[in-house]
Amino acid sequence: MSNTTTTATTTNINENKVREIYKAPMKIGEIEYIPYQGESQIQDLMSLIEKELPEPYSIFTYRFFLNQWPELCFLAYCNGQLIGVIISKKQTHKLLERGYIGMIVVDKTFRRQKIGSTLIKLTIEKMIEMKCDEVVLETIFTNIQAISLYENLGFTRIKRLFRYYTMGADAVRLLLPLNDKFLIK
């Protein structure tokens, strides 16, 4: 096999991998959902998260998630304006592959339009492709709307975390099993 053929094959494999990770944008009504594309989007997503979430995150936290698991970040745009984002990761936890949703935000003016649930569903689909056994997230214990959203998507409350957030608020941890590894046989 010549070097030219080897290079072409390697290039095709790499291009296919990129296409698999970064699927084409999906549009529902006026809302366009796109995978994270790179560093040029960090400032906008940081601004949205800082505006909507009470918990402060450093640039290092964003880069930790986005550089290692870019395929687990999705953004929602309306007419070119970033209005929603979800940032997640995958890790091994007690012999299971765990998907972890670290941050999810929808601009207040765009809530109650199923944008958050669409971002979560996109992420869960990707986590299933990545062979995750479960999905876990935390939210402020008093955030009834968010808890209701997660429970409507199949998540179950599993733990209360006292004084979990830096501002002293309690959190609730929720879990969504993705396969039957949780069943006692």
From Swiss-Prot:
Domain N-acetyltransferase: 31-179
Keyword Protein biosynthesis: no
GO molecular function term, any single one: protein-N-terminal amino-acid acetyltransferase activity
Listed Gene3D superfamilies: 3.40.630.30
Cellular compartments per GO CC: NatC complex
Entries under InterPro entries matching the protein: Acyl_CoA_acyltransferase, GNAT_dom, NAA30-like
E.C. no: 2.3.1.-
Family matches, as Pfam families: Acetyltransf_1
UniProt keyword annotations, A-Z: Acyltransferase, Transferase
Similarity annotation: Belongs to the acetyltransferase family. MAK3 subfamily.
Function: Probable catalytic component of a complex displaying alpha (N-terminal) acetyltransferase activity.
Name of the protein: N-alpha-acetyltransferase 30
Species this protein is from: Dictyostelium discoideum (Social amoeba)
Lineage: Eukaryota, Amoebozoa, Evosea, Eumycetozoa, Dictyostelia
